[in-house]
């Protein structure tokens, strides 16, 4: 069992260690507003030519970097290694390790007054000068001139691979420091490729936390099982899969949701937005009933 903290307080991390809990530092990866003034050129550009530096998609905090810019991967690797060096930190947890959502979960469309039944130019990244030049060097084509970019597999793979290379650089650095590395990822992983250009099935992390928030997709608890099954099959024993569950979505089907996760091969679960002490006790009783051990 463990806890993830978005920040660092040595006393909290030490208390976790004393209680027999792992303590992991959770930090956003590609979404880095702290670089807005230092490296404005590092930020991703959509197909309309708009940069997340000054016109982010959806919400103001969506300040995503371009993974192809020189210096981005090394900056991120160095940052996570600094975190890994901190006392009592057992590992680092990556989040927002992707491009902005080219397709949002369907339940969120109404929040922005959009219907994403196709890819919209303003949410399709990255078309900065670096990405265009690198893709043209590889293929002889300018991605801005592609008639159907959403169907061009070379262009899709170019962006999937760009994120993977950044993750590989971070992973190598963190593991060299002897620490664990995990990530919050989109469910699937087939959905992750389509929605956020995230090919996490080809990463080499120690654990994955697919965000299987069934309510976001108007799905019932059975969908949790299908998503876990695909995730477990994809990693094929190379890493652990912890089903990320949105507590308000599963509160009324708590045990059913847990069954769907564990019966389909999840090594464990993580909860977002809760649960209360009452449900933590229910969770402990569930684990005892199933004969499942906390790690």
How would you name each of these model-derived features?
Residues 1-12, 86-91, 202-208, 261-269:
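Catalytic domains of carbohydrate-active enzymes, especially glycoside hydrolases
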Residues 8, 28-30, 94-99, 186-188, ...:
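Active-site beta-loop-alpha junctions enriched in small/polar residues
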Residues 57-205, 211-218:
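Polysaccharide-binding and catalytic clefts of secreted carbohydrate-active enzymes
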């Amino acid at each position: 069992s463990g806890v993830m903290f978005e920040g660092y307080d040595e006393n909290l991390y030490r208390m976790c260690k004393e209680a027999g809990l792992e303590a992991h530092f959770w930090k956003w990866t590609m979404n880095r507003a702290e670089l807005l003034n230092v490296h404005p050129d590092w930020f991703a550009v959509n197909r309309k030519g708009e940069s997340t530096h000054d016109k982010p998609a959806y919400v103001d905090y969506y300040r995503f970097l371009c993974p192809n810019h020189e210096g981005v991967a090394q900056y991120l690797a160095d940052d996570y290694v600094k975190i890994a060096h901190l006392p009592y930190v057992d590992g680092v947890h990556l989040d927002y390790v992707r491009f902005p959502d080219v397709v949002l979960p369907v339940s969120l469309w109404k929040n922005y007054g959009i219907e994403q039944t196709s890819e919209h130019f303003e949410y399709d990244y990255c078309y900065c000068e670096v990405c265009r030049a690198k893709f043209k060097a590889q293929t002889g084509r300018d991605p801005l001139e592609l008639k159907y970019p959403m169907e061009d597999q070379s262009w899709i793979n170019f962006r999937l691979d760009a994120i993977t290379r950044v993750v590989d650089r971070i992973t190598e650095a963190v593991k060299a420091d002897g620490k664990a590395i995990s990530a919050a990822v989109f469910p699937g992983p087939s959905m992750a490729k389509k929605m956020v250009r995230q090919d996490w099935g080809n990463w080499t992390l120690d654990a994955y936390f697919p965000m299987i928030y069934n309510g976001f997709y108007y799905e019932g608890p059975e969908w949790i099982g299908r998503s876990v099954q695909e995730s477990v099959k994809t990693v094929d024993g190379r890493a652990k899969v912890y089903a990320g569950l949105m507590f308000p979505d599963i509160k009324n089907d708590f045990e059913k949701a847990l069954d769907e996760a564990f019966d389909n091969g999840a090594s464990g679960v993580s909860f977002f937005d809760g649960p209360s002490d009452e449900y933590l006790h229910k969770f402990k009783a569930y684990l005892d009933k199933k004969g499942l051990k906390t790690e």
